[in-house]
Amino acid sequence: MCGNQRERGEGNVARLNSLFGSHGEYTDTSIYGEYRAVERLAGGRLSTLYRGEHVQTREVVAVKVLSDYGCQVANKLTQRLGKPWEGERASKLQHPNVVRTLAYGKAHDRYYIVMEYLPGGNLAGLLQMHSPAVEGRKIETMRQAARGLEYVHSRGVIHRDISPRNVMLAADGTAKLIDFGVSISKADVVLKRGLRTGRPGYMAPELIRDYKYNESTDIYAFGVSLYYLATGQPPRQTSEDPFEALAMVLNTPIPPPRSVRPTISPRLEKIILRAMEPHPFARYPSVTRLLDDLLGVTDADL
């Protein structure tokens, strides 16, 4: 079960009758503060995501509900770092390219976060489907994601889980960074062992060796995302064994993007490889500098 957290946005609403019995985890129509979960969209070990609505205005939203295990992870991070959990951190981030957090709290013994609803899907899925939503505007989508990350860093936050799965599109096609569940402030970059987070294929080498998080590790993960966007495949083969996957990052050279897809321009390849330099001091010193170079390329460079 979740620990205590201050509730936000609790309205005078009642729990309703069963709705999600076929989905397993929740056996009643779940009310979270002033919002109601309507349709299960996705789920994993840490959380379940629902399409929801405001009980009075019917505004469509996304409701993220942490599982018991997700609550344990959130409590562990809060206790180890002495910092607010995801809802409180994310609610302070206000930028056109960062998902808006509308409310957060605890209900039914679980933490929840209410966010703006992004119906456009995530970038990873859109790329796999060759969706018209991103075809012809892949670079612009990543530029927008970079603007969001630039802002996040300016607010003293390190995302720690940058990947195409965590870039989603709004109805008008605007790209937004999502999922600040493992984000951390710059003041807490010296972490105790055992708190390494993120997807192995997107982890910078120094993170695997030394558990060091900073803006540069986000830049590396952004570079991996650019590589995937440009070539249609990850820079390294993946492994279901997490230790083997981490070893690949340290020991397997990155094939130059143009060796995978010769149509990629040399200038775009240069941007990708600089963002993914094994040594952090050889990477872009900031997302701002990376964004400056991205302004000089288009989808014609793919």
Describe each region flagged by the PLM.
Residues G70-K92:
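AlphaC helix of the eukaryotic protein kinase fold
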Residues Y104:
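Activation-segment/catalytic-loop signature of the eukaryotic protein kinase fold
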Residues H108-N122, L126:
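Conserved short submotifs of the Hanks-type protein kinase catalytic core
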Residues T141-M142:
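Activation segment signature within eukaryotic-like protein kinase domains
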Residues R147-V157:
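Protein kinase catalytic-loop region centered on the HRD/HxD motif
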Residues R193-E206:
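Conserved activation segment of eukaryotic-like protein kinases, specifically the C-terminal portion
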